[in-house]
Curated annotation (Swiss-Prot):
One of its GO terms (molecular function) is L-malate dehydrogenase (NAD+) activity. It comes from Shigella dysenteriae serotype 1 (strain Sd197). The active site is at 177 (proton acceptor). SUPFAM superfamilies: LDH C-terminal domain-like, NAD(P)-binding Rossmann-fold domains. GO terms for biological process: malate metabolic process; tricarboxylic acid cycle. It holds the Pfam family Ldh_1_C. Homodimer. The gene is mdh. NAD(+) binds at residues 7-13, 34, 94, 117-119, 227. This is Malate dehydrogenase. Its EC number is 1.1.1.37.
Length: 312
């Protein structure tokens, strides 16, 4: 199994590469690419870690050598959020970066599963889909927006509030990956109950957690380490499913049946060819139903922005 990380010299990319080097199954290959000249050195640095994962780094304009034979491509390239910016302020720079990289994926490893980490995910996934469609290689079961950070944050915050072990809590998060489009389904968390106030406060904290990190880093970056962990969890789940492990479920932002929006984050059963089954979002509480209806306009606008960027 070969995994390529594009944007591997950045804060998320380096954290992700470290976790993959230590956790990918023995015999895997890890390929690191970034425009930054330091990238081959990041690979050399990681190559000294004693795990049976081969690693190689590539830099420059052309990602082709890094992508050859890749089964999974994780894209974290782009600029990070600064205080006062929201994820959509990143659009102008990151849209072009994602478009360019996905064009290279379409050419070099069109059958790979692609995980988009670069924000704004609501929009960059739509860009990736349109680029792949134009190239005639789009498979909606193989393109994912990585929203796992919303899930791990939800698990952490719920566990803290309720005095549970974080590993015991799994919160499904649906919708999108910014602001009001992030909807944790707290009513579906097993063995835990919340007051209405707790639900309102937790939902808001989960939606604004990225901003919490941006402000705490005081202009020195955004959530890179927790995002690296989240992306590694998703990437490793995908690898396990591609290798035939049964019953691997993760939430991610994918093209579904369009019931709510063209792209929507929901629980997915992963399998040998990417998404095996888009699982139902289940029964929502009145609060969740209301939040779902209230976010769809924002989500649809985010998606349209990405579609127009490619097709203008």
């Amino acid at each position: 199994m070969k995994v390529a990380v594009l944007g591997a010299a950045g804060g998320i990319g380096q954290a992700l590469a470290l976790l993959l080097k230590t956790q990918l199954p023995s015999g895997s290959e890890l390929s690191l690419y970034d425009i930054a000249p330091v990238t081959p050195g990041v690979a050399v640095d990681l190559s000294h870690i004693p795990t049976a994962v081969k690693i190689k780094g590539f830099s420059g304009e052309d990602a082709t050598p890094a992508l050859e034979g890749a089964d999974v491509v994780l894209i974290s390239a782009g600029v990070a959020r600064k205080p006062g910016m929201d994820r959509s302020d990143l659009f102008n720079v990151n849209a072009g970066i994602v478009k360019n990289l996905v064009q290279q994926v379409a050419k070099t490893c069109p059958k790979a599963c692609i995980g988009i980490i670069t924000n704004p995910v609501n929009t960059t996934v739509a860009i990736a889909a349109e680029v792949l469609k134009k190239a005639g290689v789009y498979d909606k079961n193989k393109l994912f927006g990585v929203t796992t950070l919303d899930i791990i944050r939800s698990n952490t915050f719920v566990a803290e509030l309720k005095g549970k072990q974080p590993g015991e809590v799994e919160v499904p998060v649906i919708g999108g990956h910014s602001g009001v489009t992030i909807l944790p389904l707290l009513s579906q968390v097993l063995g835990v109950s919340f007051t209405e106030q707790e639900v309102a406060d937790l939902t808001k904290r989960i939606q604004n957690a990225g901003t919490e990190v941006v402000e705490a880093k005081a202009g020195g970056g955004s959530a890179t380490l927790s995002m690296g962990q989240a992306a590694a969890r998703f990437g490793l789940s995908l690898v396990r499913a591609l290798q035939g492990e049964q019953g691997v479920v993760e939430c991610a932002y994918v093209e579904g049946d369009g019931q709510y929006a063209r792209f929507f984050s929901q629980p997915l059963l992963l399998g040998k060819s990417g998404v095996e089954e888009r699982k139902s979002i289940g029964t929502l509480s009145a609060f969740e139903q209301n939040a779902l209806e209230g976010m769809l306009d924002t989500l649809k606008k985010d998606i349209a922005l990405g579609e127009e960027f490619v097709n203008k």
